Amino acid sequence: MMIALVAAAALTVEARVSFNDIAPIVWRRCTTCHRPGAIGPFSLATYEDVKRRATQIKIVTARRIMPPWKPEPGKGDFESERRLTDSELEQIQRWIADGAIEGDSKDLPPMPAQPAAEAWQLGTPDLVVRMPEAYTVAAGGTDVFRTFVLPIALPRARFVRALEFRPGTARVVHHANIGVDRTRSSRQLDLKDPEPGYVGGMVPDARYPEGQLLGWTPGQAAHPVPPGTAWRLEPGSDLVVQLHMQPTGKPETLQVSVGFYFTDEAPSRTPLGLRLGSETIDIPPGARDYVVADRYVLPVDADVLAVQPHAHNLARRMEAGATLPDGTTRWLIAIDDWDFRWQDVYRYKSPVALPKGTAIAMRYTYDNSDGNARNPHHPPARVVWGQNTSDEMGDLWIQIVARSAGDAAVLADDIRRKSHADDLAAYVKLLREDPGNPLRHDAVGNLYLEDARYDDAIAEYRASLSLNADSAPTHYNLGFALSMRGRRDEARGAFEQALRLDPEYAQAHNNLGAMLQLAGRAGEALDHFRRAVALRPDNVDAQINLAQLLSAQGRAREALDHFEAALTLRGDSAQALAGIAWIRATVADPSLRNSEQAAELRQRLILYQRRQPYRQSNFL
């Protein structure tokens, strides 16, 4: 009887966990970052690597600091989740408790093949853009936040199906935010800074393209956009990359590169970027439970594809969810311990379907007390909304798409109204607090211009120029607002002043040409249109204005060249289609006349159903 009992007890003894058991977990969850050449400060690719760090691994996995994954389980079903499962965590803890034994190396499963740290995950890109100059991060000091402008050499508009970010020196880059600037205002800031890039965040003109949430964090895999949602990249655009960089103890040089993957398939649906949050944050010193909350009611049925929370150092808890018309609720995301150092775009495994009338809400809680170890201010100080790390933000970006193509315009217009109202309230508040800052007047003026509040915009631009008369963009924007009020002589003077300050301001040449043509000074107008095109061959408006004036002067062959250049840049340009069709149908020169092409272009015009007026460039 005793022998039987002993035997039975022996059968219940669990085998010791060896590295053979946990290696697949480490390779799946950790070596994306922790391998030679990758961003992790040390490698975990071998048994020796992992055993050397066993005590540290025990602590950071038990506290769920590593692998970094902030969303709470059960409150959003996301792709590429890095969180350890409970069973994986238990196995790692047992292995370390058992002495971190290796086991029989011949039983070790093979490590999955991984691309080189700097290899393209999606294959060879169609286009690669790079920082024009490398940037060196000092050996020591605090974290560095800097924005870089990467010019995009693109002869015509293309649809982007994927974008892949390569940090260069991966161990230095903590995360990146990426936008597209069609105005070149980011480039102007870059030119004014003697070092590569510039200090500060992305300007408002550097935007996510057409509802895409672009960014990079360590371990983040590159993914193509969802089917049918490719986005349009216009020629003349700049890629703007805001980097959070960390000193490593020695000087590190980096040069970011970004790969673009194109498709000829036009999007069948266009996602939108819905931003919930506040730009009027004002947190008193010592406040422990300052709340930012916002909500938005869907005007149509829609699908949520991804979310991206953003705040700085004082945020502690984040919650976002949806209340459906029948009263049921759904979590979108929850983060109990926000950490500014670990940001990400969280993409749902399946779109979150929300019916019309659903209220989407967010609530962030901030702690501006000494009890917050991440508070950058000691003693605590008043913290307001702003782009600097010592300021605070509170945004929830939501990538959303209308369920029906017919509802897309309704959703886009409704989101635009909300965003514009939020922006205007924020920048008016900033202006009141800092009326001597010309940039504040410019920002409010630009928002008034978008609202067609031209007199208000004119007043803000004049106030800005009273503080800084040497700003060519402000003179240009003033000229645009004056032209929209029909004050052409004053507008012409503003454009001329912009060109005195910046003779290579292509948009000012274009719009001055427009004013001169309307004044009957066609010869001078032609000179400015030619100069605008020479400076910016990718400026569709200037190409069209030049072509139209040449056509009116009977210079059909040259006009055709510029109409066709415009059509190459913007394939749905009604002016270019109409201009080419008119010349092909009416020109006397038999070598240029082409009735068949004229008829085809007229049909394209009918299909587009667009009748665009004579265009000037937009502001900035």
Describe each region flagged by the PLM.
Residues 7-155, 236-242, 247-249:
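Aromatic- and Gly/Pro-enriched helix-to-coil junctions and flexible linker segments
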Residues 439-450, 473-484, 507-518, 541-551, ...:
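Conserved alpha-helical positions within TPR/SEL1-like repeat arrays
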Residues 586-595, 600-620:
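Terminal, low-structured helical/coil segments at or just beyond the last alpha-helical repeat
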Residues 117-403:
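His-enriched metal-coordination microenvironments in redox/metal-binding proteins
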